[in-house]
Every structure is written in C-alpha cells, then in structure tokens.
A protein has these predicted regions:
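Cap/insert and terminal regions of metallo-dependent hydrolase folds
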Residues: 72-83, 201-285
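Metallo-beta-lactamase
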Residues: 76-79, 84-90, 94-106, 122-187, ...
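Zn-dependent metallo-beta-lactamase
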Residues: 1-56, 61-65, 69-72, 172, ...
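Active-site metal-binding loops of divalent metal-dependent hydrolases
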Residues: 8-9, 59-62, 103, 135-136, ...
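Residue-level marker for buried hydrophobic side chains located in beta-strands
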Residues: 55-57, 99, 130, 207-209
Length: 285
C-alpha cells in the first residue's frame, strides 16, 4: 500500500463560523484571521494505492461553480485536483474508487464536472465506484434548511444518475473495522448525518482521515466546535471519544482542512487532549 496527499485547492472561511462560540482572542492564536476575519483552509485529499485499487478520499470543491461562488471563499494558491493527481503520476481515469466522507460541497465538488459542451454535468472519475452511505445520501438529497446551501444538487445527483454510486454498509457499532474498501470507517453524526472517518492501517501506523470531525489542529480542545456542525452537543462526546482513542493508540491524524499542519498526533495532558507532534505529509506517507 502507498498513500499520497492530493491537494485540491486552498480557500478561506470566516474564523468565527469555523470556531463557533469560542472567542476570537483564543482561536486567533492558532488560526490567525486576515483583515476580513477569514482563516486559511485547505482541501487536502488522500489517495490510496492498494493492490489493483486506487482510492481517492474526498475531492475538494472542484471547478464547475461560478466565479461569484468561488469569490465567497477567496480561493488562493495554485493547487488543483487533477493537476495534483498528475504530479503523483496518475490520471483521473485511473481512479477505481471515490470515497466521500460527506456531501458538503468542499468535500465532493470535484466528484462531478461539466461535460465537454458545458450543457450538463458528468462524473469526473469515469471508471470509479463512488461511495457514500444510505443514511447520509438521504440526508443530503432531502436537505434541512441549515445545510441546504452546502448540499448542491449538481454535486450529488449526477453521481446517482451515472450508476456509479454504492453505499458503505452501516452497523449498530459506530466503528466498522473493515469496510468494503479494506479500511475502517467511523460514523459520526455531530457535523452532519453519518459523516464517515476512514481509519487506514499503513505500515505500522493508523492514519485517520479526519474530515470535519477535526478540521484543523486548532480544533483539538473539546469546546472548539465549528458553527457549521448541525448537532454540536453530539460533536462533543464524539470528538472526546475519538481524541482519547487517538492519544492512547498514537493515531496519525491527517487534517483535510488545515492549510499549515498536514498530519498530527495528540496526547493526554492535565488540560485534556492537546497537540503532540506535527508532521509534513512527506514525513509519514
């Protein structure tokens, strides 16, 4: 097995929205805001080479939205999903599986592209099976008013219409040790219904793709919960259990949205779970 970090683009969001009720004087220490109160964020995907499979976890925002749409998120840097794949020696048609942690636009936008004539949409990865789960799919296709702006039909429905969609089986246990893609999956409901957190056994390590359970290293303290979470009081125990397990088992936490800290470990302290070590992707993958 080989793992590759795939940078799909950098963007910015309001720091207050990213940290909920936590005062700016606190979160600004780890995630400094610009003059517009926005903080730097990444869309860092993970590519898994495993035998004959080439599995892409999440896809970033993609490039099919309008300039006005992207203007809201102040895109920065030169990263692009397809270009990042090429830099690793791959083409989009090589991808066999696309695993979507959830269907918010910054995680699944790159899964669907314009067709050649710009008259409609098509899946970006023609030879891939797309993986979601049934609970989350229904949640996203019949969205609540709060999340509706994050679940864009053009990112979601073409996947189903293509016939490439499959669902990861859920169970009564929130952690599946061995999914259809040969890695573990933790299901969490605080951010959105049945977000999926991959746990990948790699050499002698466990790599956890944290998605929006832990978007940045600045979100490690327990009360530091995003304002975007639909059930913040559920995020708290989910995050507490996860971080304690991560500290006890020395998990390597792959941060999808942290523009500056790629992979981290955490440790127990008198103040709770805190940052332990920071690694670049080249140190670990």
């Amino acid at each position: 097995m080989k793992l590759h970090a795939i940078e799909a683009g950098n963007f910015k969001l309001d720091g207050g929205a990213m940290f909920g009720v936590v005062p700016k004087v606190l979160w600004n220490k780890t995630n400094p805001a610009d003059a517009n109160n926005q903080i730097d964020l990444a869309a860092r995907c993970l590519l898994i080479e495993d035998g004959n499979r080439l599995i892409l976890i999440d896809t970033g925002m993609g490039n099919k939205q309008s300039d006005k749409f992207f203007g809201f998120y102040n895109m920065w840097g030169n990263f692009d999903l397809e270009q990042s794949l090429k830099q690793k020696g791959f083409h989009k048609d090589d991808i066999t599986d696309v695993f979507l942690t959830h269907l918010h636009f910054d995680h699944c936008g790159g899964a669907v592209s314009w067709n050649n004539s710009h008259t409609g949409y098509e899946t970006t990865f023609k030879n891939a099976t797309y993986w979601s789960n049934e609970n989350h799919w229904h949640w996203a296709t019949e969205p609540n008013a709060r999340e509706k702006a994050s679940f864009l039909s053009e990112n979601i429905l073409p996947i189903q219409e293509s016939g490439q969609l499959k669902f990861i089986e859920t169970s009564n246990n929130p952690l599946i040790n061995h999914s259809e893609l040969n890695f573990g999956v933790l299901f969490v409901d605080g951010h959105t219904e049945k977000q999926m957190i991959p746990h990948i056994k790699y050499q002698d390590k466990t790599i956890v793709f944290c998605a929006d359970l832990l978007p940045t290293a600045g979100h490690i303290p327990l009360p530091y919960v995003m304002g975007y979470d639909t059930r913040p009081l559920l995020t708290l125990p989910e995050k507490d259990r996860f971080l304690k397990q991560a500290a006890a088992n020395n998990f390597y936490l792959f941060l999808e949205h942290d523009a500056h800290n790629h992979i981290i470990t955490v440790k127990e302290t008198e103040k709770g779970i805190r940052l332990n070590q920071v690694f670049s992707v080249n140190d670990i993958l």
